[in-house]
From Swiss-Prot:
Keywords for the protein's UniProt record, in alphabetical order: Decarboxylase, Lyase, Pyrimidine biosynthesis
PROSITE patterns per UniProt: OMPDECASE (PS00156)
Superkingdom per UniProt: Bacteria
The name this protein goes by in its record: Orotidine 5'-phosphate decarboxylase
Protein family according to the UniProt entry: Belongs to the OMP decarboxylase family. Type 1 subfamily.
One CC-aspect GO term: cytosol
Active-site residues, as the UniProt record annotates them: K64 (proton donor)
Gene Ontology MF, one: orotidine-5'-phosphate decarboxylase activity
UniProt xrefs under SMART domains: OMPdecase
A Pfam family: OMPdecase
Binding site for substrate: 13, 35, 62-71, 122, 182, 191, 211-212
Protein source organism: Pseudomonas paraeruginosa (strain DSM 24068 / PA7)
Purpose: Catalyzes the decarboxylation of orotidine 5'-monophosphate (OMP) to uridine 5'-monophosphate (UMP).
EC numbers: 4.1.1.23
């Protein structure tokens, strides 16, 4: 498998294997990695990861595990056994849960995926947090959870690009994965806190998750190439 040097992760947010592979077959694994989320994984199970890896892609398994420490750690181990490049868990599961995942990966005898923490979903604003009992700005909650992730030894965080500068300043070791990326002129859809790819990298993001601007483009390969060119 050729190592991808691009920061772009294309979201394969599809309900079927056929639809996901139809897009993947138009993409160059040297120009992007791919993300398998809940819908596709639930539909296709682990086989979709194997197929994508056989096509040369590094896979971000975006299942956002959140359970008691042992259960979550065993799920992360199962992801590592699949050969995924990156896996994520919810930071709100707490320090012990994240630390258990870290310890399990350290003991894993094989390539270790990047272990990424999910802070605050990019669709959530202050009123959404208030609705679940958190009277706090999203950025404050992100910083609170980031400190737990750092303490637990996580490799990085999922965060919006607006949070990236503060996170890089406070936790320069952590790699930042940013969804809600829309090239200039794209619709915002359901991601509220968004920036363009260039703005996100300049803000401190390390990896950019891009879905509909590529997957729904008339020519996905051309759309991907245009973003790569924009990033220089």
């Amino acid at each position: 498998m050729s190592a991808c040097q691009s920061p772009i992760i294309v979201a394969l947010d599809f309900p079927t294997r056929e639809a996901a592979l139809a897009l993947a077959d138009q993409l160059d694994p040297k120009l992007c990695r791919v993300k398998v989320g809940k819908e596709l994984f639930t539909s296709c199970a682990a086989g979709i990861v194997e197929i994508l890896r056989d096509k040369g892609f590094e896979v971000f398994l975006d299942l956002k595990f959140h359970d008691i420490p042992n259960t979550t750690a065993m799920a992360v181990k199962a992801a590592a056994e699949m050969g995924v490049w990156m896996v994520n868990v919810h930071c709100s599961g707490g320090l012990r849960m994240m630390a258990a995942c870290r310890e399990t990966l350290e003991a894993f005898n094989g390539p270790k995926p990047l272990l990424i923490g999910v802070t605050v979903l990019t669709s959530m604003e202050r009123e959404d947090l208030a609705g679940i009992g958190l009277d706090i700005e999203p950025q404050e909650q992100v910083l609170r959870l980031a400190a737990l992730a750092e303490k637990a030894g996580m490799d990085g965080l999922v965060c919006s690009a607006q949070e990236a500068p503060a996170l890089k300043g406070a936790h320069p070791r952590l790699q930042l994965v940013t969804p809600g990326i829309r090239p200039a002129g794209s619709a915002q859809d359901d991601q509220r806190r968004i920036l363009t790819p260039r703005q996100a990298l300049d803000a401190g993001s390390d990896y950019l998750v891009i879905g509909r601007p590529i997957s729904q483009a008339a020519d996905p390969a051309k759309a991907l190439a245009a973003i790569v060119a924009e990033l220089g």
